[in-house]
Amino acid sequence: MSDDVNSSATSTSSSTVHFDDTPFEDVYEIETELGSGQFAVVRRVRDRKTGEKYAAKFIKKRRYATSRRGVTRQNIEREVRVLQKIRGNSNVVELHAVYETASDVIIVLELVSGGELFDHVCAKECLDEVEAAAFIKQILLAVRHLHSLHIVHLDIKPENVMLKQRGDSQIKIIDFGLSREIEPGAVVKDMVGTPEFVAPEVVNYEALSPATDMWAVGVVTYILLSGGSPFLGDNRDETFSNITRVRYHFSDRYFKNTSKHAKDFIYRLFVRDVDQRATVEECLQHPWIRGPEGNAIDIRKASCITISHIQSFKTRQRWKRCVELVMVLLKASKSSRRIGDGRFDEEDMVASCTLICAEEGNLRALHKLSALHKLLPNATRKSLKSSFSEPNGATAMHCAAKYGHAEVFNYFHMKGGNICARDDNGDTPLHVACRFAQHTVAGYVANEKIDVDSINKTGETALHCAVESADTRVVRLLLQLRPRLDLPNASGDTVLHLAADSINPRIVPLLVCLAPPLHLRNIREETPLHVAAARGHVDCVQALLDANSPIDAVEQDGKTALIIALENGNVDIASILITNGCDINHADHHGDTALHIASKHGLLQAVQTLCHCAVTVDSVNANKKTALHLAAHYGHVDIIRVLLLARADVTLRGDDGLTAELVAVAAERLEAHSLLKMVKSQEIREEYISQLYPLDTSLRRIKLKLLGHSQSGKTRLVQTLHSSRGISSFLESVTRRISDHYSPSSSMKDDGIHSTNGSFVSESNNNSSFDLAAAAGSKYAPPHSQYTRGIDVQTVNINGCGEFSVWEFGGYEPMHTCYDHFVGNADCIHLILYRTSDPTEVQYKQILYWMNFLKGRVTPFEPIGHCGFSSRRSKVIIVGTHATSSLFPQMNQEGEYVSSDIEAMLNTVRLRFETHFDMDHRLILLDATNPSCIGMKTLKMELAKCRTNILAKLLKPLAILDTVVNHLNLVRKKHANFPVITWPDFIQLVRNEINPLTGDAHCRQIVQQLQLIGELVYLRNDLCDADYVVLNAEWFGTHILGQLLSAEFLSKASPNGSYHTSSLAKIFPEIPEQSDLMTILEVLQLCAPDARTGAHEFPVFIQTEAPDSIWRPYSLKEKERDTVYGGVRILPMRGMERSLHSTFPRIQVALRRSINDYQPAKDTQLHQWSECSKLVSQDREAVIRMVGDAVEIRARGPSESATSMFYFMEDLINLVEHAAAEVGPGISLERHFISPKHLKEHREHPALFPPESMMEMQQRESLSVKGTQDEEELFTDVVCFGSRDVARHLTLGIDVGVADLQMASRCELACLLDPPHAMGRDWSILAVKLQLTDQVPDVDSTGQSLSRTDQLLNEWAIHHPEQASVGNLCRILVELGRCDARDALYRTVPLYVFAPLEDQFLLETNDSGVVSSCHSSSEHNPINI
């Protein structure tokens, strides 16, 4: 039991024991090992001064509270205190001294060298009871000494009764490791001792007492007299049963000659009741111990103990140990013998089993083996018989180190294992542990203060091995020991070379911190920078450069780090080297420069960077070839363009006499040859080059975008701004634009399109008529017949302001669904118009709508400015139209209309949106019919100022831009019927027809500038890689979108929104390929193909209302009872109401696409109606619909598939949120979960669980959440459909890291906490709460440019990542008294983050039939539910 039962940590005193920290080996010389235990080894030592010999017990300390290795300091101190207290008795081992090292406590005791008492008895020919009683009396005297001091030994057994010297009869009690100090009345319970010798109270876990030792004395006496163990059974359970029942007997075979006094002595000790058991004093007075009184005959002399019985006992013990040893060996080697891997050696079973246990980490077997045989931790295998075996010479410690078995390694070390042993490769265990990234073992060895710079046969130190393992923990550990960093291995590589070539880029910065030599070279003459440049880790290269590594050092072939980086395709590293000032014109031994290498390998970015840094472009190599020759030979046309722009000489010839053009011909590089041929002339080449340089002037125009509801005066304002000549000029320009670009076909006036048959009247003219009376009952009725259709685009030169591309966005609401493709850029001016004749409430709602519309469609930019201001605010001017003197009788000194009500309203709007928009503080009220009104002049002044400010921030136009603009007019005529081309076609158009040297970057800049001046529209295609360029924005906005989304078309459209491609020919007969137009409409996400019908579905056209029966209880009560419900409403953040209405058709498009993308969708059906969709997937169904301002999702399915229902719902939520984010990236969404209980009851108005309630529940660590109707439900039911498996994989919102906060959350906090607070509850006090006072000066130094709150949160996430969670931040905000900031955080953080369940769990589930483009998992696979 002493080996298998852990001792308790009962302290004997509250005082701390102090040990001598003098180096032990300075005082004593360590000699042979005398014995060992689990965590201790006893060795004979000799005092260096006196020569006196002692027994030193080396006890391994437990280093960590959670570790299982070693003995706790509390237990060691307890043993020392016991030994100190019991000094001075001749029958107890004497304490001499106690020392302490980093890993051990060494207890120095008197040397007891006489051996065990029983061995002494076995050596005698005979032994009578008098001698036996004398031995027992000495044990009793020792026990009396202990008990008088309230010490209980608890492990009295034959092995702990020793003779002081060989041949001497004086005994000593040893081993006080389990001893306790038990004061009278104290209750101490513990399972300690050796099974055969423990008392019943130990087995029954009852209070220990001095009587516990007396039971053990009885067992020792029984064995001494008979040679048999009184309670020993076939197994431990039987032994314990015998003890608790006090089941023993005096066999005639062994006790035939034993005196009755001896039997009575034993009988008095084997008493279950501790109060009735004989005490030590009673035992000393017992006749068998005391002997006869006076001259009485001593009957003990007549009783002679049969020595053979004791010898048999010892023999049985030895045989038992041998059998147990064989069993342990066979069991430990079972796996090796079964697979026959050659590790088990029958000729050396103990050594081979030791090695096997070391490899397998079988500490339990080692404990058993150690108890039966001396361990051989330094043994090695004789030969290699399999690939599994370790190298020759590998000891058990090498094996344990390789496989990371730290406890086994520690055990071997305590058993005398050589921690510095070397195998045949010269590796020590530290080398092996580091090579295999076993940081725990490496840490153990490192703490033993061994030579960390020891090298093996290949010159490697342990640090070499650690770096090769790429394990940062091991490297950090070794660096704490300050190893040498300049030692090379057999290849000449220092640890820095190896780190530069490691797969782990974090090692080089660690080494660089210790200032290693950076100039050392390996046998290839490479510095670490060369190696890092070849490997490709940017962080490594940067760290070496920051440490002043020689940047232009050359290796054996004359190559610098720059050339090596380019040879390996590491362009990012090449850019860093160039930025740090390396020699870009250096040539290697072959004459190749970095430009030659980059041109040869097609590294366009590198060539561009080198040319930008004025590299010598015509440098020749050993073959007289320039970079242009190499680019021509390998056909890198884009690089040829860059070299020509850098004015490379096209006439230079190589050693073969060929120019670059001829080289391209010889290599059959036709495109390269064509390009070089076109620029052969110096004059033409210079002209092309000059076109691709920016001009000194600004762009000719910018966009002016007008937004407002119908009848807000947009068209009339544009008319007035267009020309001082008034409406006749405007009508003339409209007529000209229509006649130039397209003409309405006659069929469009007579024949419309329908899913079956039908017609409608439609005209492309913006001012076409519409029968309002006929459409009075239609949901698509416009407010007036002359409403703007789509987006009217025209160029206007405003007198005194300059030229603008004016984009008038129609106010007709169905058109809003596609406006996100045309708004969102900050490099333009937005005019929001409202009618001053409308009631103030109407004005306010309309302005809020368009401000929110713009805010939602403008992507917020980093960094966050002071008070949450966006770094790039769009310019917005709010203009009141229809202003007359009758409405505004008061004017200011400049003659402008004045209105305190409107001024107050606009101030409210400015305060609400100033973080996102740059808004003018002047009140602009005008009459659009009067070009000379003061308000018009004010507007023009503001437009001129804004235009100047925006143009000043934009890049200067390329000289080629005007040429492209002029050429586009010709291209538009060529593509008049369908002015749309792909992006690759546009690039080829520019190169083939304008300038062949135009690169991709030039084309991107040209298109960007053409968009800024309103010449075309660039459509990004998420369906495939081919983006599109619309050459005529007016055609696109008015003729296509204005017609398809007009009231005329919508009122006659197919009720189910389904159209075949051929149907488009009836609307747009002039377009030759209707499939091209359908593709463009798909790119705009106005439609999606329906795989079942082969037609395209246009959700915006759908007029059919959803039936009332789409969400009713199941007719079968059993099915309804076994159904789980769930739901959520996705709302825009507070203050952005009605932001999702225009996005719902796009959500329906995304739903249809998801069904198409999911191939095995035969069991999945999607039905769509106006503002409602229903998805049925096998036995699950969901309804997605607009409810007020929210998109509501309700789902239900079988209760046994609750986990799959969560997946189903989660995918739908992600799909809706992703679709909404594509339309409005600035719309922050909230999830309001619906009561599953109320859904199951089919209540008309179910309770909701808003984000604040969900987050508050998490903060309280509650399991239930309270809804809006004050009813509580379990969080798992509300979110997880009752699935606890799902709940276990959720990361709650309070546990989300601050570093992962979305920008909306950060902006809200900045807006609330950046401004100074009257009570000081702002960012400065927050810094104190976050323990970031040291960072305050740096944060405060940024002034008004950056948000101090946002910077603080970033610092918190960096310096305290474990504490920087949303939950902790919310708690701190409450302590700060800023519940408003907490509530804002509650509304904007994710309520949970979901990690998908294990694959084996998912295999048991079915598929949902929904593909979410924002799925929680790392891969965009179909959802497995």
From Swiss-Prot:
ANK repeats lie at residues 392-421, 425-454, 458-487, 491-520, 524-553, 557-586, 590-619, 623-652, 810-841, 934-963. The active site is at D155. Residues 28-289 form the Protein kinase domain. It catalyses: L-seryl-[protein] + ATP = O-phospho-L-seryl-[protein] + ADP + H(+); L-threonyl-[protein] + ATP = O-phospho-L-threonyl-[protein] + ADP + H(+). GO terms for molecular function: ATP binding; GTP binding; metal ion binding; protein serine kinase activity; protein serine/threonine kinase activity. One of its GO terms (cellular component) is cytoskeleton. The keyword Repeat applies. ATP binds at L34, G35, S36, G37, Q38, F39, A40, V41, V42, K57. Keywords: ANK repeat, ATP-binding, Cytoplasm, Cytoskeleton, Developmental protein, GTP-binding, Immunity, Innate immunity, Kinase, Magnesium, Metal-binding, Nucleotide-binding, Repeat, Serine/threonine-protein kinase, Transferase. This is Death-associated protein kinase dapk-1. It comes from Caenorhabditis elegans. The lineage of its organism: Eukaryota, Metazoa, Ecdysozoa, Nematoda, Chromadorea.
